[in-house]
Amino acid sequence: MLVETKAKVGVFAIALGAYLPQFPTLVPEFETQYDAFKKTIPDTVEMIDGGIVTTKELSMEAGDKFRAADEDLVILQLLTYATSYNMLPAVRDLNVPVVLVNVQKRKAPDYANTDTPKWLGELYACGAVGEMVADLERAGKRHAVITGVVEGGDAYVAKEIDEWCRAAQVRRRFRYTNIAQIGRPYPGMMDLYIDETNLYNRMGLYTKQFDWEKIWAIADPVTDEAAIRAKAEEILDTFDIEGGATVETVWDMAKYVVAFEEWVKKEDLGMVASHYDCLLYTSPSPRDRSVS
Protein backbone atom coordinates (compact mmCIF):
# COMPACT_ATOMS: atom_id res chain seq x y z
CA MET A 1 0.00 0.00 0.00
CA LEU A 2 1.22 3.49 -0.76
CA VAL A 3 2.22 5.31 2.40
CA GLU A 4 0.07 8.32 3.24
CA THR A 5 2.74 10.70 4.49
CA LYS A 6 3.37 14.34 3.73
CA ALA A 7 6.42 15.45 1.79
CA LYS A 8 8.74 17.81 3.63
CA VAL A 9 9.45 21.01 1.72
CA GLY A 10 12.05 23.53 2.88
CA VAL A 11 11.05 27.13 2.21
CA PHE A 12 13.15 30.25 2.63
CA ALA A 13 13.73 33.66 1.08
CA ILE A 14 16.93 35.58 0.40
CA ALA A 15 17.91 39.23 0.23
CA LEU A 16 21.23 41.07 0.55
CA GLY A 17 21.73 42.02 4.18
CA ALA A 18 23.69 45.16 3.26
CA TYR A 19 20.51 46.74 1.88
CA LEU A 20 18.61 46.67 5.16
CA PRO A 21 20.53 49.29 7.21
CA GLN A 22 20.48 51.62 4.20
CA PHE A 23 16.77 51.18 3.50
CA PRO A 24 14.95 50.15 6.71
CA THR A 25 11.55 50.05 4.98
CA LEU A 26 12.72 46.92 3.18
CA VAL A 27 12.45 44.87 6.38
CA PRO A 28 8.64 45.04 6.78
CA GLU A 29 8.26 44.87 2.99
CA PHE A 30 10.20 41.62 2.75
CA GLU A 31 8.45 40.15 5.79
CA THR A 32 5.05 40.85 4.23
CA GLN A 33 6.11 39.35 0.90
CA TYR A 34 7.55 36.25 2.53
CA ASP A 35 4.47 35.68 4.68
CA ALA A 36 2.29 35.92 1.56
CA PHE A 37 4.59 33.57 -0.33
CA LYS A 38 4.42 30.87 2.34
CA LYS A 39 0.65 30.81 1.94
CA THR A 40 1.12 29.65 -1.66
CA ILE A 41 2.66 26.37 -0.45
CA PRO A 42 -0.14 23.77 -0.48
CA ASP A 43 -1.11 22.14 2.80
CA THR A 44 -0.60 18.73 1.21
CA VAL A 45 3.06 19.04 2.24
CA GLU A 46 4.81 19.81 5.51
CA MET A 47 6.61 23.14 5.21
CA ILE A 48 9.97 23.60 6.93
CA ASP A 49 10.39 27.36 7.37
CA GLY A 50 13.97 28.54 6.92
CA GLY A 51 13.02 32.21 7.27
CA ILE A 52 14.36 35.26 5.48
CA VAL A 53 18.08 34.78 4.93
CA THR A 54 20.24 37.89 4.67
CA THR A 55 23.65 36.58 5.79
CA LYS A 56 25.83 33.52 5.41
CA GLU A 57 25.19 32.62 9.05
CA LEU A 58 21.42 32.65 8.60
CA SER A 59 21.84 30.53 5.49
CA MET A 60 23.83 27.97 7.49
CA GLU A 61 21.11 27.91 10.16
CA ALA A 62 18.48 27.28 7.50
CA GLY A 63 20.61 24.47 6.09
CA ASP A 64 20.89 22.84 9.52
CA LYS A 65 17.11 22.96 9.88
CA PHE A 66 16.55 21.50 6.42
CA ARG A 67 18.98 18.63 6.97
CA ALA A 68 17.43 17.77 10.31
CA ALA A 69 13.99 17.66 8.69
CA ASP A 70 15.13 15.21 5.98
CA GLU A 71 13.27 17.19 3.36
CA ASP A 72 12.29 16.27 -0.19
CA LEU A 73 12.42 19.67 -1.91
CA VAL A 74 13.62 23.24 -1.38
CA ILE A 75 11.65 26.24 -2.62
CA LEU A 76 13.53 29.54 -2.50
CA GLN A 77 11.85 32.94 -2.86
CA LEU A 78 14.08 35.61 -4.42
CA LEU A 79 13.09 38.91 -2.78
CA THR A 80 15.76 41.07 -4.36
CA TYR A 81 19.43 40.78 -5.24
CA ALA A 82 21.41 38.49 -2.94
CA THR A 83 24.84 36.88 -3.07
CA SER A 84 25.81 33.25 -3.36
CA TYR A 85 26.44 33.10 0.37
CA ASN A 86 22.77 33.79 1.02
CA MET A 87 21.78 30.57 -0.74
CA LEU A 88 24.53 27.96 -1.02
CA PRO A 89 25.12 27.19 2.69
CA ALA A 90 21.41 26.34 3.01
CA VAL A 91 21.42 23.78 0.20
CA ARG A 92 25.02 22.59 -0.05
CA ASP A 93 24.52 19.33 1.86
CA LEU A 94 21.08 18.52 0.46
CA ASN A 95 20.45 16.05 -2.34
CA VAL A 96 17.06 17.45 -3.38
CA PRO A 97 15.89 19.79 -6.16
CA VAL A 98 16.04 23.53 -5.52
CA VAL A 99 13.26 25.62 -7.05
CA LEU A 100 13.99 29.34 -7.43
CA VAL A 101 10.84 31.46 -7.34
CA ASN A 102 11.50 34.65 -9.28
CA VAL A 103 8.20 36.40 -8.65
CA GLN A 104 8.11 40.18 -8.83
CA LYS A 105 5.61 42.11 -6.72
CA ARG A 106 4.63 44.70 -9.37
CA LYS A 107 3.88 44.20 -13.04
CA ALA A 108 5.58 47.49 -13.95
CA PRO A 109 7.22 50.44 -12.16
CA ASP A 110 5.37 53.60 -11.32
CA TYR A 111 8.32 55.62 -12.54
CA ALA A 112 7.18 58.93 -11.07
CA ASN A 113 7.01 57.43 -7.58
CA THR A 114 9.76 54.80 -7.65
CA ASP A 115 12.83 55.34 -5.51
CA THR A 116 15.66 52.95 -4.63
CA PRO A 117 13.82 51.13 -1.80
CA LYS A 118 10.77 50.69 -4.04
CA TRP A 119 12.95 49.30 -6.81
CA LEU A 120 14.83 46.90 -4.56
CA GLY A 121 11.75 45.81 -2.64
CA GLU A 122 9.12 45.46 -5.34
CA LEU A 123 10.80 45.29 -8.74
CA TYR A 124 14.13 43.49 -8.46
CA ALA A 125 13.32 39.85 -7.64
CA CYS A 126 15.14 38.87 -10.82
CA GLY A 127 18.38 40.47 -9.66
CA ALA A 128 19.90 37.25 -8.33
CA VAL A 129 18.48 34.67 -10.74
CA GLY A 130 21.53 34.40 -12.99
CA GLU A 131 23.99 34.17 -10.12
CA MET A 132 21.94 31.59 -8.22
CA VAL A 133 21.49 29.38 -11.30
CA ALA A 134 25.23 29.53 -12.00
CA ASP A 135 25.95 28.58 -8.38
CA LEU A 136 23.59 25.63 -8.48
CA GLU A 137 25.05 24.43 -11.78
CA ARG A 138 28.58 24.54 -10.40
CA ALA A 139 27.48 22.80 -7.21
CA GLY A 140 25.82 20.02 -9.21
CA LYS A 141 22.40 20.72 -7.75
CA ARG A 142 19.18 19.93 -9.58
CA HIS A 143 17.24 23.15 -9.98
CA ALA A 144 14.42 24.96 -11.73
CA VAL A 145 13.20 28.56 -12.00
CA ILE A 146 9.59 29.74 -11.72
CA THR A 147 9.07 33.27 -13.05
CA GLY A 148 5.95 35.36 -12.59
CA VAL A 149 4.32 38.31 -10.86
CA VAL A 150 2.33 38.79 -7.65
CA GLU A 151 0.20 41.76 -8.70
CA GLY A 152 -3.10 40.57 -10.14
CA GLY A 153 -2.34 36.95 -9.33
CA ASP A 154 -0.44 34.47 -11.46
CA ALA A 155 -2.06 31.10 -12.07
CA TYR A 156 1.10 29.77 -13.73
CA VAL A 157 3.20 30.32 -10.61
CA ALA A 158 0.61 28.67 -8.36
CA LYS A 159 0.36 25.71 -10.72
CA GLU A 160 4.14 25.25 -10.89
CA ILE A 161 4.54 25.36 -7.12
CA ASP A 162 1.71 22.87 -6.68
CA GLU A 163 3.21 20.49 -9.24
CA TRP A 164 6.63 20.60 -7.59
CA CYS A 165 5.01 19.82 -4.24
CA ARG A 166 3.15 16.92 -5.83
CA ALA A 167 6.42 15.58 -7.18
CA ALA A 168 7.95 15.86 -3.72
CA GLN A 169 5.02 13.89 -2.35
CA VAL A 170 5.70 11.08 -4.82
CA ARG A 171 9.34 11.05 -3.76
CA ARG A 172 8.41 10.83 -0.09
CA ARG A 173 5.97 7.99 -0.70
CA PHE A 174 8.49 6.02 -2.73
CA ARG A 175 11.01 6.26 0.09
CA TYR A 176 8.63 4.30 2.32
CA THR A 177 7.29 1.92 -0.32
CA ASN A 178 8.29 -1.67 -1.04
CA ILE A 179 8.01 -3.49 -4.36
CA ALA A 180 7.32 -7.22 -4.49
CA GLN A 181 8.76 -9.36 -7.26
CA ILE A 182 7.17 -12.79 -7.49
CA GLY A 183 8.61 -15.65 -9.49
CA ARG A 184 11.33 -15.32 -12.10
CA PRO A 185 11.59 -14.47 -15.80
CA TYR A 186 11.74 -17.22 -18.38
CA PRO A 187 15.39 -18.09 -19.16
CA GLY A 188 16.83 -15.67 -21.69
CA MET A 189 14.40 -12.80 -21.07
CA MET A 190 17.19 -10.49 -19.96
CA ASP A 191 15.23 -7.26 -20.44
CA LEU A 192 12.98 -8.09 -17.48
CA TYR A 193 15.68 -7.99 -14.83
CA ILE A 194 15.96 -4.76 -12.84
CA ASP A 195 18.89 -2.99 -11.22
CA GLU A 196 17.75 -2.93 -7.60
CA THR A 197 20.65 -0.72 -6.54
CA ASN A 198 19.83 1.92 -9.13
CA LEU A 199 16.12 1.76 -8.30
CA TYR A 200 16.81 2.26 -4.60
CA ASN A 201 19.38 5.03 -5.05
CA ARG A 202 17.24 7.03 -7.47
CA MET A 203 13.77 6.49 -6.07
CA GLY A 204 14.16 4.96 -2.62
CA LEU A 205 12.17 1.88 -3.65
CA TYR A 206 13.10 -1.33 -1.83
CA THR A 207 12.51 -4.63 -3.64
CA LYS A 208 11.33 -7.77 -1.85
CA GLN A 209 11.72 -11.10 -3.64
CA PHE A 210 9.18 -13.93 -3.31
CA ASP A 211 8.77 -17.34 -4.92
CA TRP A 212 5.45 -18.73 -6.05
CA GLU A 213 5.51 -21.63 -3.59
CA LYS A 214 5.21 -19.15 -0.73
CA ILE A 215 2.62 -17.00 -2.47
CA TRP A 216 0.28 -19.90 -3.23
CA ALA A 217 0.55 -21.04 0.39
CA ILE A 218 -0.62 -17.74 1.90
CA ALA A 219 -4.27 -18.77 1.45
CA ASP A 220 -3.89 -22.00 3.46
CA PRO A 221 -4.47 -20.47 6.93
CA VAL A 222 -7.43 -18.28 5.87
CA THR A 223 -10.58 -19.49 7.67
CA ASP A 224 -12.72 -16.35 7.93
CA GLU A 225 -15.73 -17.48 5.90
CA ALA A 226 -17.51 -14.13 6.26
CA ALA A 227 -14.56 -12.31 4.72
CA ILE A 228 -14.29 -14.89 1.93
CA ARG A 229 -18.02 -14.68 1.16
CA ALA A 230 -17.90 -10.86 1.08
CA LYS A 231 -14.96 -10.99 -1.30
CA ALA A 232 -16.73 -13.55 -3.49
CA GLU A 233 -19.75 -11.27 -3.75
CA GLU A 234 -17.45 -8.37 -4.60
CA ILE A 235 -15.89 -10.44 -7.40
CA LEU A 236 -19.33 -11.28 -8.80
CA ASP A 237 -20.37 -7.62 -8.65
CA THR A 238 -17.17 -6.43 -10.29
CA PHE A 239 -16.61 -8.92 -13.11
CA ASP A 240 -18.85 -10.17 -15.89
CA ILE A 241 -18.01 -13.87 -15.77
CA GLU A 242 -18.90 -15.74 -18.95
CA GLY A 243 -21.28 -18.62 -18.36
CA GLY A 244 -22.34 -17.23 -15.00
CA ALA A 245 -20.87 -17.85 -11.57
CA THR A 246 -21.90 -18.21 -7.94
CA VAL A 247 -20.28 -17.57 -4.61
CA GLU A 248 -19.37 -21.24 -4.48
CA THR A 249 -17.68 -21.28 -7.90
CA VAL A 250 -15.47 -18.30 -7.05
CA TRP A 251 -14.90 -19.35 -3.42
CA ASP A 252 -11.28 -20.48 -3.89
CA MET A 253 -10.51 -17.33 -5.84
CA ALA A 254 -12.07 -15.14 -3.15
CA LYS A 255 -10.15 -16.96 -0.44
CA TYR A 256 -6.92 -16.28 -2.23
CA VAL A 257 -7.76 -12.59 -2.78
CA VAL A 258 -8.48 -12.17 0.94
CA ALA A 259 -5.12 -13.75 1.72
CA PHE A 260 -3.34 -11.69 -0.92
CA GLU A 261 -4.71 -8.39 0.37
CA GLU A 262 -3.62 -9.26 3.91
CA TRP A 263 -0.19 -10.23 2.60
CA VAL A 264 0.16 -6.88 0.82
CA LYS A 265 -0.58 -5.05 4.09
CA LYS A 266 1.74 -7.27 6.11
CA GLU A 267 4.66 -6.79 3.71
CA ASP A 268 3.86 -3.05 3.33
CA LEU A 269 3.79 -3.22 -0.46
CA GLY A 270 3.01 -0.42 -2.87
CA MET A 271 3.53 -2.41 -6.06
CA VAL A 272 3.56 -6.08 -7.02
CA ALA A 273 5.15 -7.52 -10.15
CA SER A 274 5.03 -11.18 -11.13
CA HIS A 275 6.28 -13.30 -13.99
CA TYR A 276 6.96 -16.84 -15.14
CA ASP A 277 7.38 -19.70 -12.74
CA CYS A 278 7.61 -23.23 -14.11
CA LEU A 279 6.24 -25.03 -11.05
CA LEU A 280 3.22 -27.26 -11.59
CA TYR A 281 1.02 -28.55 -8.82
CA THR A 282 -1.21 -31.60 -8.72
CA SER A 283 -3.73 -30.65 -6.04
CA PRO A 284 -7.23 -29.68 -7.28
CA SER A 285 -7.04 -25.97 -6.50
CA PRO A 286 -6.05 -22.69 -8.17
CA ARG A 287 -2.48 -23.86 -7.73
CA ASP A 288 -2.96 -26.35 -10.57
CA ARG A 289 -1.44 -24.22 -13.24
CA SER A 290 1.79 -22.62 -14.31
CA VAL A 291 1.87 -18.89 -13.73
CA SER A 292 2.81 -16.33 -16.30
Regions found by a protein language model. Give the residues of each.
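C-terminal appended segment following the main domain
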Residues: 262, 276-279
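A structure-centric signal for secondary-structure junctions around beta-strands
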Residues: 6-8, 176, 286
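Active-site-proximal region of nucleotide-activated glycan assembly enzymes
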Residues: 133-138
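Metallocofactor- and cofactor-centric catalytic cores in central/energy metabolism, strongly enriched
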Residues: 2-130, 141, 147-163, 168, ...
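Short, well-ordered beta-to-alpha junction loops that form the rim of enzyme active sites
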Residues: 184, 274-277
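Conserved small/polar residues in nucleotide/adenosyl-binding loops
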Residues: 281-288
